[in-house]
Amino acid sequence: MSQDYLWFLAAVFFALIGFGLHYAQKHPTRWALRFQVTTSVILIVWAIIILVIQFLIVVEASKKVEPGLDYVIVLGGRIKENGKPSKALRERLDMVVDYARDNQDTYFVLSGGRGEDEPCTEAEGMAEYLIEEGVRKDRLLVELQSRNTHQNIWYSKALIEKNIQDNLGTMNGNLGDNAGPVLVAEEKPKRIGILTSDFHLFRAMGLARKAEYREFYGISAKCDVWLYLHFAMRETLAILKDKFMGYM
């Protein structure tokens, strides 16, 4: 569902509420009074829900960045018609550039398929931007199929697990054909970061928890206030939807 569509639905909803309250004041019957009370309760409950969710979003986004992670999953965003990342996505990628410079052993999983109005997959657009900014290509893994945050989390987890197994196979292959049976002790869990915009991080972390990530940390890319406010309503609805669907 597009952002504009959500704003339109919200505008229609509050317009209907406003019309109903105005009508109830002009025609003060018993049913009108009940409508006023019911509507007021709904609005108060909705306001409390929004405030609680926004508080949780701010708390999650304020946590300290964990250094030295094995993998960082970078959640995709819109790629513009000219192939360049949107403002919100560019802020995420600039955070990747900084983290890559300070943490030389970290791999980055770029997660995002191709939207209807995008010239390429979000993962490919992100990879191109990061390579231009000096991040080595061999540190990038691309996940090209996901279409939403839920899929970002699950598909990226599968890609990381495959990469770990491939590296383990390479290690065993280097031992030679005559090495005999090899017992490999279970490795400690890989430390995984999830990097996305500040308004988006709380939901992404909830989805990762449901997907049974073992040791994971959030990395928040700050966005400007107006962009945050623009996404606040959509993210609130998305969190409620994912909670209802059992994704969080």
What label would you give each PLM region?
Residues 15-19, 42-52:
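Alpha-helical transmembrane segments
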Residues 45, 51-234:
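A structural signal for short, hydrophobic/glycine-enriched beta-strand patches
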